[in-house]
């Protein structure tokens, strides 16, 4: 500012620099200051710092003041400052800033509002410089909580770390708190760093600076069917006053508290649901807890309903809730003692077994192990099972009666070779080797007795390896194997030509049956032929006492075919082709069956080894194996067939032509006869037609006249009927109209009469009401009163006129002239007497 005269208003100030001494001083208004030549005004007058109520400001590098509050000056006259320090100033008179002082501005504002601490809130503050407050000294680093509601008065030695909100603790909840340092809490309980505890007091809880809130713990509602399993993190005494060891588990139930809040050193393991048992249920508890609270590992406890309980820690129910075993009349339980105990009056040793037969309800005891629930096995007369005695090892079969296993008996499984199992499931007990299933799995119940249906005219050999002897069963029959018996499996040749082991079978068909085979033979002139032979066979056995020789030859088909083929080859080798071709059947039959002493061919071929008999042999085909020979033979045969066929065709053609000529002659003769009959019939028809035309001509005119007369009669009759109908309709219409008019007039007359009656009744009622009204008025007013009213008018008029001095009066509008001559007397009325 360059003006020499400076006008400083009230509550304004300037800084004047003395250029000679380089000292700056402050001048406050109101004043008019004349600046000297060696002085410089550093800035225009500016307002003083004003701090309103409930506000404060921070001044940096404040000036030093004396005990009386005056500003302390240095020897040079400069204001002495506390450099690097700050000063908080509250409401008061506006003050100037001395040279060197600065106003600390936050967010562009130098004056700040005092902070209000609301309820359930606190300020976490920290001392950054030692200071003395009243009678105590506060060291740097000290922290404390300023709780609301109040106004926070700031200090330069104290900084606000954070604003802390109180945590509300609701019913059935608690606050988990941890100590940061060693201290004594507000309840007077000493705490060490890292210690945790629960604050259970309801309401708002404002933590101290030595505490850390870890969270709000929600309580668990307990009931008769719900408990809480807990585990101790460290050794401590719980809220119920019980000492707990680290790692220990226990349960809290409704008997302890309706609501449990997990403590700081407790861990929730699980919610435990109650086990409810009905009268028909029980459970087996493993590792039960004794009266001291310890588990008896390895032991079991049986509980039967009706009851409700909780499983204690360490207890398990591997099998869950089980139904009481209801043992029926045809059932039993196999039991085994696991330890020595007394069952009623009987002493049971460990390992001893016994059976309990129904009907009853059974619950296993701790000392007893349930081995098996057995039932009576119902068996038909053709059903059975294998049973083994576990004491002696004897195996037997039970057939055709219901059976219950005894204590020392078990079902014995009879295993058969896989090939036999597959044959048992085949339809007829036989199967082709090429059709065997490599992945076959038997579905037979092994303890069921092995059964096989022997077909009609078949036999099965069963071998008992314990007795070392077989038995033969003839069909139709049902075979049941004893425990030590096995089937004899037949392996037969099959196919054409025969291949060994092509067919496996459990039963031997006794025949009569047939078999076919193909063999190659060579004649004496070296012609090779392929023969297809079929032969019938059967087994000649005694059904009352079948012989074992029947099954002595395992492959009787292959043996028979080989024997027959050998005989046929030998016989054909002695014949040339032409001779064999002409007499093949006879040569083969003679070779196979042989001849008797008389030289005749025998009827059959018998194999004495197994009583196998071949009764007939048939040559189905015979053809050379060489292709050229076969073709030439076929051509010669075809040529012979053609010659025979043509001769037969010629004979047939001649016979047909002869029959055709005879048929044509008969046909022509029949045609002539038919024409004669037709002409005769035509003549008769013409005669009848002439007669018909004559009758028709005479009767047509008569019919027409009759028809016209009949039509005229019908027309006249219909017109008469129509006239009658029209007259009847007109009469009905007139009568209806007359009746309608009469009804209308009657209704109108009735309406008029009723209307008149209503009017008369209304008039009569009105007159009566008026008369009654007048009568009642007269009665109410009275006769004397009426007389007085009647006289009151004239008397009043007379008095009015007398008072006015008038004899009469007339009222008019002035527009209508009135002739008053002779009318005055009438208008005034009678004179007063």
UniProtKB/Swiss-Prot annotation:
PROSITE patterns: MVP (PS51224). One of its GO terms (cellular component) is cytoplasm. Pfam families: MVP_shoulder, Vault, Vault_2, Vault_3, Vault_4. The keyword Ribonucleoprotein applies. Coiled coil: none annotated. MVP repeats lie at residues 54-118, 119-170, 171-223, 224-278, 280-328, 329-380, 381-433. Keywords: Cytoplasm, Nucleus, Phosphoprotein, Repeat, Ribonucleoprotein. Gene3D superfamilies: 2.30.30.560, 2.30.30.570, 2.30.30.620, 6.10.250.720, 6.20.380.10, Band 7 domain, Major Vault Protein repeat. Signal peptide: none annotated. It is found in: Cytoplasm; Nucleus. Required for normal vault structure. Vaults are multi-subunit structures that may act as scaffolds for proteins involved in signal transduction. Vaults may also play a role in nucleo-cytoplasmic transport. The vault ribonucleoprotein particle is a huge (400 A x 670 A) cage structure of 12.9 MDa. It consists of a dimer of half-vaults, with each half-vault comprising 39 identical major vault protein (MVP) chains, PARP4 and one or more vault RNAs (vRNAs). This is Major vault protein. It comes from Leishmania infantum.
